[in-house]
Amino acid sequence: MNAELTELIFILDRSGSMGGLEADTIKGFNHMIAQQKEQGKKVNVTTILFDDEVDIIHDRFPVEIIEPLTEKEYYVRGCTALLDAVGTAIEKMDSVQKHLPETHRAGKVIVVITTDGLENSSEHYTQEQVRRMIEARKECGWEFLFLGANIDAGKEAEKIGIARNRSVTYENDSRGVELNFKAVGRAVSKAAAAAAVTDFIEDDWADEIQTYKR
């Protein structure tokens, strides 16, 4: 296991209800990536955009080569196939980890899920399937963060096996989106710099998001 390598999987909602926040989302994502580049740690990034389809735009790219996200990639449309996006991400990363030599496997895997609404269009994975997948990967030390707007994020996270202290309900406005990416960026930076390969996300990771009220 390579304790110096972090795999970051970012699952980002681009369904129609995200309309009006495209520029804020793009700006926040790009700032987060720039933050990781500045830190200089070994981070591979997988970015998955989802609506009623799942689109992988970065497939384990070293963070230093990632180009800024633009409106060509991030544009809103469609419904919310959240379970399909999460299931696809886990199976893909799980396959990679299993087939790499032991010394090339990431010591830390962080899956960040952001959505502004409830699941409503998945066709390939059920809630129970995803819950079991997440529970199994948590046993291997993977961390999952769930950020949700317009929903009870803690309740929805628990349905798929993510603890409440790894979830947060955010305000779906410009400032709320900005705080989301800042919080995730800090959490990832601390995790990438940590020597430990378990429990590398701090429990206060979402405090700034929680204190913001529109």
Features from the language model and the residues they span:
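Acidic, low-complexity intrinsically disordered regions
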Residues: 1-214
